[in-house]
């Protein structure tokens, strides 16, 4: 299940992120890559333990809590501290096909998570750079993603994916992983579809409609059945 979620950050927030990031020191992006990924990763990132990365990461986490769609789709248990990368055309930056590590550990907090879902939050407008397309492969084919600044994409971390070479301008983004309460991707997708249908019924019939109440109960019982907390 690949889901694009709009307006996690508004334009003013994006501009402030970019102002802070443009003034920061960057390092080789391979410092956080696994063995296979490091062979195909060519980009830069903010040092993960830097004050700048940690402060911006906290702002991303706060923004996520304001998005009911993100919570519904991800059902997050643990979210890895957000990281930040930069692909510059002047350096021929790209990221070849790879799959993310199954487990990620944070050196500073000691947090270890199973990476159920990968997230990219775009911080550059699509017209500001050429290339830099996130391409994700899943059961249904290949999906190309290039979203407006402030929007994010959520997709299974088990997916093969790549970022095409940036040939003009600079692509800046936040990226991170999360462990969902619901491990199984198919179960999580069904729960999301059910929640979407329930919310539509609430809008039409009201929250106290008997059938809406019954379906809401089914939603929570499925969470109870599948969730690991």
Curated annotation (Swiss-Prot):
Binds 1 Fe(2+) ion per subunit. InterPro entries: Oxoglu/Fe-dep_dioxygenase_dom, PKHD_C, PKHD_hydroxylase, Pro_4_hyd_alph, Pro_4_hyd_alph_FE2OG_OXY. GO terms for biological process: DNA damage response; intracellular iron ion homeostasis. 2-oxoglutarate binds at residue 171. Gene3D superfamilies: q2cbj1_9rhob like domain (2.60.120.620), Rabenosyn, Rab binding domain (4.10.860.20). It holds the Pfam family PKHD_C. Keywords: Dioxygenase, Iron, Metal-binding, Oxidoreductase, Vitamin C. One of its GO terms (molecular function) is 2-oxoglutarate-dependent dioxygenase activity. Its EC number is 1.14.11.-. Its cofactor is Fe(2+); L-ascorbate. Fe cation binds at residues 98, 100, 161. HAMAP family: Hydroxyl_YbiX. This is PKHD-type hydroxylase OCAR_6723/OCA5_c13470.
